[in-house]
Design a protein with these regions (language model features):
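Structural detector of well-ordered beta-strand residues that form the stable sheet scaffold
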Residues: 116-117, 138, 157, 169
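Amphipathic alpha-helical segments enriched in hydrophobic/aromatic residues interleaved with Lys/Arg
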Residues: 159-171
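Active-site-proximal catalytic alpha-helix in oxidoreductases
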Residues: 123, 169-185
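Extended, subdomain-level signal for the structured scaffold at the beginning of enzyme domains
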Residues: 1-116, 127-128, 145, 157-159, ...
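A conserved active-site-flanking secondary-structure segment within enzyme catalytic domains
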Residues: 132-159, 200
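Glycine-rich, charge-decorated loop segments at or immediately adjacent to ligand/cofactor-binding or catalytic sites
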Residues: 124-132
Length: 209
């Protein structure tokens, strides 16, 4: 596992959003990284914020998440800041994974990012984009067989919350994205901030996957 050194500027965190994205897949990481910014100011007032978070979509039109939640993207593929951390959530991903524009942006963003991570079935988008091609990975328990069948070069892991390969991290389903994001905060900004973030969110935090 690679630990990324502290940055003098906020690390750009881009969360991909698309129609039928799972609401907690995007909301969990968003809450973790933005809460970490608030907690940094409580732990060390006046220090630089560690993260700048944006939701990125194919266009600036509102995205309708699974179950009807509407999300207004902060940027589209042409205006988004180059991410240091790319988060690809899951949901009903068939359309997003089949979209050439989405695959191209994900591949380009991942190539320049320090860490690329998927939540749940977001692993299918990473695989379709050619970012996740082989080695260990995980996804929602319900989709493990499909991920193995569609991408047989992957070593799909069961009964883990996340799989960390350094620059590439995949998590299990839905709420596991919160755990993985806390893990990423620990890697990027230190375990003290991760623990304080988990406490603020009133969520149990286990640093082991």
């Amino acid at each position: 596992m690679t630990t990324v050194s502290a940055s003098p500027r906020p690390l750009q965190v881009a969360i991909l959003v698309f129609d039928d994205v799972e609401a907690l897949d995007l909301g969990g990481p968003y809450e973790v990284f933005t809460t970490a910014c608030r907690m940094q100011q409580r732990l060390q007032p006046g220090t630089p914020t560690p993260f700048a978070v944006q939701c990125v979509a194919r266009s600036l039109q509102p995205v309708q998440a699974r179950a009807g939640l509407r999300v207004l993207p902060d940027a589209d593929f042409t205006t988004a800041a180059a991410p240091d951390v790319l988060i690809v959530p899951g949901g009903v991903v068939d359309t997003a994974a089949a979209c050439a524009e989405t695959r191209t942006w994900v591949a380009q963003a991942a190539a320049g990012a320090q860490i690329t991570a998927s939540v749940c079935t977001g692993a299918f988008i990473l695989a379709a984009a050619g970012v996740l091609t082989e080695g260990p990975a995980t996804t929602h328990w319900e989709d493990i067989a499909d991920l193995r069948a569609q991408f047989p070069a992957l070593d799909v892991q069961e009964n883990v919350r996340w799989v960390d390969r350094g620059a590439l991290v995949t998590s299990a389903g839905i709420s596991a994205g919160i755990d993985m994001s806390l893990h990423l905060v620990a890697r990027l900004a230190g375990p003290a901030l991760s623990k304080r973030t988990a406490r603020q969110m009133d969520t149990p935090w286990n640093p082991e996957p």
